[in-house]
Amino acid sequence: LDSISDIQTLITCTGLDDFVNHRFHIDKIFKVTHPKEYIRKVLNEHRSLKLEGFPTFTGGLVGYFSFDYFKYSEPSIIKNQKDNGFNDVDLMLFDKVICFDHFKQKLILIVNIGTNDLQKNYKKGIKELDELDYIIRKHVKTLVQPLKLLEDFKPVLSKEEYCQMVEKGIDYIKEGDIFQVVLSNRLYAKATGSLFDSYRVLRTTNPSPYMFYFASDNIEVAGASPE
């Protein structure tokens, strides 16, 4: 999957209780104990067929669950939370997909339609496919400001704090509480521009089976599997 088109619905979870469902404007804000029930409801309402020759993803929810999402399953370990700029959940519902198969060098345009009025929706789907085809053939380039760091990266944890985590992890392993632990130390820096060009360079110089670029109103995320 290399591209998706036209958001139908945006689902955002901003805190332990607040859940927002909006389509270009806020439709509703409500409280949830765990977001997964509402997300599962949306998925059940937007099922699509798996067709031979099509990619595994032909439409649905795209986005991220932040690290802090774990608190909905284990609220007892929430403490000293720091705002890292991410919502707990940001998911966008898409019914149109522009899929580029890098291996086959093949472009696939996909439009999902509802079955409530099949003939009417089919004609609408054909029109939307023609519109996607027109957009691609126009070759309109979007200027993207390259990423520029305004300062050096700084770690969230000091060397002493990180070493303490390592020692604590070793103790937990010795005591039999855990058998493996993956520690990390997030780096941060002020920057301007977009991650998109950085993602394109990464995709060219270090192609990986798992790569991603995601952008919403206030967040950009890009990455690749290390192997």
Where are these regions (language model features)?
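Extended alpha-helical targeting/anchoring segments
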Residues: 1-227
